[in-house]
Amino acid sequence: MGYLSKLVTSVVFAIPLASAHLAAYTPGMYCPENSYKGTLTNATDPNLVVFDPLYNLPGDSWFLSKGRNCLLAEPTGVWEIAANTIISVPWANWQNSTGYYADGKEYNERPIPYSVTNPEVIAEGLVSESKGLASPNLHAANKSTAAGTAIAISYESNIWAVTMDTLVVISTAPQTPFERLANYSIPDLAPCKECICVTGWVPDGFGQQNMYMAAHKCKITNPTGGKIPKTPSSVPGPGVKGAKQMIAAFQSEGNNVEWNGGEVVPTYSTRMGYLVGAQTDIFD
């Protein structure tokens, strides 16, 4: 495929914005108000908002959006996830979002189909300079080019103890984010009163090549028992089986996947070994 997977040892807005990017919003989200509101001024990421992209950052800055001090902006609740179900998660720019699309617009408030090839979309100025849809900023030309998003879990209650090795991707949702709500099939996970979940997205073109990562305090329920995913998780890549890490790419250090311009983009899809939907191989 042209890209090489390898470990690198070095390791506030109240309303939606048309130009904004996207994050997954849950009751357990760190930076629930979109950014850290404390008095510290030691941020190492020039982008301070949780839905902004992560790009060209050192490992301790991009991982879990630490460089934005999001780990100091505690969640206001807990994200409860039931194993062996399908859950819906909003991708948006603000908490308690509404609408069919992530910018708050309903289905009938956008041209149908919502695609850059639709003359109505072009006429309304909804095509970005990077040839993708401009609002919301989906890094996609239409639903079929939406790269896919993922949920990962670490069976750690202390977020400061979470590492890439303890995180395991548990579900992917192809052709997301596009609509505001993305649906994820959850595998047979063991119960967990307090774990750390992480949502991620790697766009496939239509703008700067970057990634997104947001942390959440989560709780897993499963009346039938379930299992804990195998760790340490493996670096994702073509044909990789079993429990896999999240994708870390396009950063100055700490990448687990190296990418050069013109190569196939590593996304949360089968091209990096992920299954579609529930990652049922994570217990093998």
From Swiss-Prot:
EC number(s) reported in the record: 1.14.99.-
Cofactor info, note text: Binds 1 copper ion per subunit.
Any coiled-coil regions, as ranges: none
InterPro entries from the UniProt entry: LPMO_AA14 (IPR054497)
Signal peptide: 1-20
Keyword Secreted applies: yes
Recorded family membership: Belongs to the polysaccharide monooxygenase AA14 family.
Chain's role: Lytic polysaccharide monooxygenase (LPMO) that plays decomposes some specific network structures formed between cellulose and hemicellulose in the plant cell walls. Catalysis by LPMOs requires the reduction of the active-site copper from Cu(II) to Cu(I) by a reducing agent and H(2)O(2) or O(2) as a cosubstrate.
Protein name: AA14 family lytic polysaccharide monooxygenase B
Organism: Talaromyces rugulosus (Penicillium rugulosum)
